[in-house]
Design a protein with these regions (language model features):
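Histidine-acidic metal/acid-base catalytic patches
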Residues: 1-132
Length: 132
């Protein structure tokens, strides 16, 4: 996620572009949402000076980053939503009996988020279990 009024945010999120997977993007503001199929399409629109007049304030990109990791500002993860869900599950254990850790995009993460996959999975499990 990132704020659209932060000039460096577009360059930061552009580092996540890679051709293997689609990374849908949604913007919100003024009670409306705009949807983009993939990051390059979104970046082209967001960089257009006319876009600023649409009142969009925040953008979120579909990209599975490790829960234990936080991207460099001005980007941020949305793992607080996962934390809320895990908090709910603590008091409602019947809500979910298993968890899935999605790792398929980890191999195409920007370099500063790259680690050996076994280490990433171990850290991901550690983070999830620490929340339970």
């Amino acid at each position: 996620a990132f704020d659209l009024d932060t000039p460096s945010a577009l360059e930061a999120i552009a580092q996540f572009h890679e051709p293997t997977y689609l990374h849908q993007l949604i913007t919100s503001g003024n009670g409306t949402n705009l949807y983009f199929t993939d990051l390059p399409e979104a970046l082209a629109e967001l960089r257009d000076p006319a876009f600023g007049s649409q009142g969009q304030q925040e953008a979120r990109v579909h990209f599975h980053i490790p829960l234990y990791a936080e991207p460099e500002p001005p980007l941020r993860s949305t793992k607080d939503h996962v934390g809320d869900l895990l908090d709910y599950r603590k008091s409602h254990p019947e809500f979910c009996s298993h968890f899935e850790i999605e790792t398929y995009t980890w191999g195409v993460l920007p370099g500063d988020l790259q680690k050996p996959i076994v280490r990433q999975i171990a850290e991901e499990y550690r983070w999830v279990f620490s929340q339970l």
